[in-house]
Each structure stands twice: as structure tokens, then as C-alpha cells.
Amino acid sequence: MEPDFADPLIAVRDLRKVYKVRGDKKAATEFVAVDSISFDIAKGETYGLIGESGSGKTTTGRMVLALEKATSGSVHFEGNDITTMSELDMRRYRKRMQIVFQDSGSAFNPRRSVGAQIGFALERFRMADKGEIRSRVLDMLSRVGMEAAHYDRYIHEFSGGQRQRLGIARALITDPDFLVLDEPTAALDVSVQAQILNLLKDLQQERDLTMLLITHNLALVEHMCDHAGVLDHGTLVESGPVDDLLTTPETALTRALVDAVLEPAAVAS
């Protein structure tokens, strides 16, 4: 299904995050991590949030998911402002909003099988009986390119690429509408990056997923995204269609990111 740009699933408005920083024997000072940014993500779209380390992109992703409280501003999911909701009210949205981390292995308990952990959300949200959970997880493992035998294994037994596939399975098991991808391929070889990105694109088409891709790499955005924004020290300095960012960048930072873009074949092959 094509994205519906007239009907955003996610609407971010003037989102701001300020941390209190207390130094040795000094009064607390304020650090503005994210400074009043706004963007929309259409249903079925992948929106890219590009920035260097420390630019505020991961903090933004966490606020969009209501995993971190915003200092001010709003995030609307289907028209409902989730920044003002209690955790109890947010519970009905949690299964519809999921995240894939840079190192999915770190999100797994090393003492429990990966299959049991992937299936836990089905139990938590009462989406399947205990007798159904294993079969649902096995189906999902198969869909992300893993094997049934992997269900009972532990996270340390898998390669980086396999860990990302497991992280994707864990995120998708609740059949979410919205997925945040936080540097999902940063720690992987280029050939494995391509496999993971192409898997995500296939899954997006199958499931009509809306996605926020957080990355420092404009080549990934070129391959995955419709629209994107560039973050610099917490400020959204440029945003728009990806083609415009690539062909007519307006800021020095965006031009530098364009200059660093890999050949598309290196990502998409």
C-alpha cells in the first residue's frame, strides 16, 4: 500500500527535551537535547531522522514512543496525544508501537531462550493462549529468515545479523502499526546490512507498517525513506522529500551527509 501523506499516523509538534545537568560543586544547568522539532509520518511511510552522534535523534525516537517523557510539545498517534497519557492509558498503544535497537542482542535476557522472550509480549498483551504462543513465534521466526531450532537457543549463540532478525521478530510479534528503527544496521557488515534493510522493506509492504528510521547514514535513508529530517544538536535544520535533500541540500551539514553517501548498490544490493 502506498503511503497516505494527507493522513499522518504520527504527528510530532514542537517536541522538546531538556535535561538538568549537575556538575561538581555547581548549580544545575540545562542541556537542551531536542529543541522544538516538528514532523509528520504518513501511514505506510518510512521517515528518516538523520544526525551525527549526540544530535538528539535517539532521544527523539524514545519520546515518540513515550519511552521518555518530553519536556514540552506533543506526539499524536492517530490524533491522540500520547505525551499526556498515563502509563495505564498508554498500555493499549504499547503493542502497536515497537522498536528495533542498534544491538538487538542487548535487549534479550542471556538466561532465557530467545523464543520465550519473543513470545512474552503475546502473553503480556493477552494476544494468544499459552498453547498458541510457540506456534506464533515459530511462524514469525520463519518470516524473518530464522529456523524453528533457534527458538530454544540463547542470544549469545547468534551472529550480529541473526540478532537483528530476532530483534525484528520480537518487535513485530504484536503486529504493530508503527516501528522505530534505531540505527538497525550500524554494527553490521555491508552485505548483512542489505539483507536486513530488504527484509524490513518486504515486511513493511506485507504489514502496511509505518516506520521511523534513525540513522547517521544518508545512504540508508535514500534506500528506505520517502521523507527525512536532519538533526543538528537537537534542532531540525532541514526536512522534506529525500530526493530534495539529496539533490538540493540547503545546509552545510546536509551537504556533508550527501558527500558521504555510499553508492546505492552498497546498501541495496
Where are the regions that the model predicts?
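ABC ATPase NBD coupling module
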Residues: 24-28, 82-98, 116, 124, ...
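Conserved ABC transporter NBD signature motif
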Residues: 73-81
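Conserved ABC ATPase "signature" region
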Residues: 81, 132-149, 258-259
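Conserved ABC ATPase signature
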Residues: 154-158, 162
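Conserved catalytic motifs of ABC-family nucleotide-binding domains
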Residues: 175
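A short, surface-exposed alpha-helical micro-motif characterized by mixed small hydrophobic
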Residues: 221-223
